């Protein structure tokens, strides 16, 4: 079952790369709701299809988790392209701040009440994990590692106030739909 879910995403990698390109990004940007061809099936009026980017990291994390459980290096070699392309997406999706850190701007996180937010904690943490997993996979396979993967994974911002992870930059206790920081 798990492999068939991963095969579904891998078989539609070209469409994810096309979606990233349409939005001006590199790599692969997986749809929030994918149809059978890999096209975005979310209605255009729903911002989740356009802005809920953490699904791309979720896909990459699932690929790495499958490898860690199976230790199937042949499978990993064949599917490394998914980890690489999603890492390339995140590197192209971030913006560099004046202090040298990185941010991901204008997203919807798992908390779908919070739209057009910057540095959503779940999105950023998932992107960090996806980048680190791409590095681990590349190391395992002796594949080249883009130095930007490491730089972004180490400097992507997660906002905290008084030791508490904030849902997103500027979060001040607004009502939430899903407590996405609990997913970290």
Predicted regions and their residues:
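A structural signal for alpha-helical segments
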Residues: 70-78, 115-118, 122, 144, ...
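Aromatic- and histidine-enriched alpha-helix N-cap/loop-to-helix transition segments
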Residues: 1, 50-61, 78-81, 119-129, ...
